[in-house]
């Protein structure tokens, strides 16, 4: 008969992205081995408590910084509820609504890297843009589900053992 079989421990390694010798504020890629599974979070937006899209009721809360803080807190709570955490992020996609004064998404007043770094500095420092963030992409959009929304997040995280 066979010997005792044990599950391997999950390993998640995010590789840094450099341009020359400069560290970029996104990861090159994340390699996950022996994960129990994955969590996919989509449509994370900052809406009022009584938001009801089927009745066109409610909309976004606050200014761009307030929306970013709310979304980040929401996705942290959602990950934890589903058995993962910020430590196990594999990839993040940011959809940022214009305007884009110089043509690029990063020029939008709705893109708030400062708020993102503030959040990660408090909750998961390894993912700050100046440290070793997960791979991510920032995509500029003309509109989101509600006219006053300025950012939406899609997150993939691994489920640990």
Language model region names:
Residues 1-73, 77-91, 96-161:
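N-terminal presequence-like segments and the immediate start of the first folded domain
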